[in-house]
C-alpha cells in the first residue's frame, strides 16, 4: 500500500525520480494514465488490471462508459524506471496534469493506497487549501449518507 506525499522536480526531459517509499511498493511494469481530477495515476500492472476489469464490468451500451474507457485506454502508457529510478512522463500526460496552467517542473507524488497520484504542485496545493477539518467532516457525512 502507498501512502504519503512528496514534492519532486522534473528535469528538462520530463523525467522524475520516483520517491523510494513509493518505488518500493510498485512492481514494474507500471501504467501511467489520466486521472479523474486533473492528475495522472501510476499503477502496478496488477492494480491497472483490476482498474480495467472494473471498467469492463460496466454496461458497454452506455455512451458515457464507452467515452470513459476510450479516454483512459487512449491515454495510458506503460512506464519503466530507468537506472536512476526515474520515470519519463509523456507529453500528453504532462498536458493533462498541467491543463489550464503553464507547464511546470514541480510535481507531487501522492499515495492513494493502491496506486500513486501525480499532481502539478499548484493544483494539489489548491485542492488542499479547500479542505478544512469542518469541510472534511461534512464531506464524510455526505459520502456515508448517500445510498
UniProtKB/Swiss-Prot annotation:
Keywords: Cytoplasm, DNA-binding, Repeat, Transcription, Transcription regulation. GO terms for cellular component: cytoplasm; nucleoid. Signal peptide: none annotated. SUPFAM superfamilies: AbrB/MazE/MraZ-like. Its main location: cytoplasm. GO terms for molecular function: DNA-binding transcription factor activity; transcription cis-regulatory region binding. It is found in: Cytoplasm, Nucleoid. Disulfide bonds: none annotated. The keyword Transcription regulation applies. One of its GO terms (biological process) is negative regulation of DNA-templated transcription initiation. It holds the Pfam family MraZ. The keyword Cell inner membrane does not apply. Residues 5-47, 76-123 form the SpoVT-AbrB domain. Gene3D superfamilies: Transcriptional regulator MraZ domain. InterPro entries: MraZ, MraZ_C, MraZ_dom, MraZ_N, MraZ_sf, SpoVT-AbrB_dom, SpoVT-AbrB_sf. Forms oligomers. Belongs to the MraZ family. HAMAP family: MraZ. PANTHER family: TRANSCRIPTIONAL REGULATOR MRAZ. This is Transcriptional regulator MraZ. The lineage of its organism: Bacteria, Bacillati, Mycoplasmatota, Mycoplasmoidales, Metamycoplasmataceae.
Amino acid at each position: 500500500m502507498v501512502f504519503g506525499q512528496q514534492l519532486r522536480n522534473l528535469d528538462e526531459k520530463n523525467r522524475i525520480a520516483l520517491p523510494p517509499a513509493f518505488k518500493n511498493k510498485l512492481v514494474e511494469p507500471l501504467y501511467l494514465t489520466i486521472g479523474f481530477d486533473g492528475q495522472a495515476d501510476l499503477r502496478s500492472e496488477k492494480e491497472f488490471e483490476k482498474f480495467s476489469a472494473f471498467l469492463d464490468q460496466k454496461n458497454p451500451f452506455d455512451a458515457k462508459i464507452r467515452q470513459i474507457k476510450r479516454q483512459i485506454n487512449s491515454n495510458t502508457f506503460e512506464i519503466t524506471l530507468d537506472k536512476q529510478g526515474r520515470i519519463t512522463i509523456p507529453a500528453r500526460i504532462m498536458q493533462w496534469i498541467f491543463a489550464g496552467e503553464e507547464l511546470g517542473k514541480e510535481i507531487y507524488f501522492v499515495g492513494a493506497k493502491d496506486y500513486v497520484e501525480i499532481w502539478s504542485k499548484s493544483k494539489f496545493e489548491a485542492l488542499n487549501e479547500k479542505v478544512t477539518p469542518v469541510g472534511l467532516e461534512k464531506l464524510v457525512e455526505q459520502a456515508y449518507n448517500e445510498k
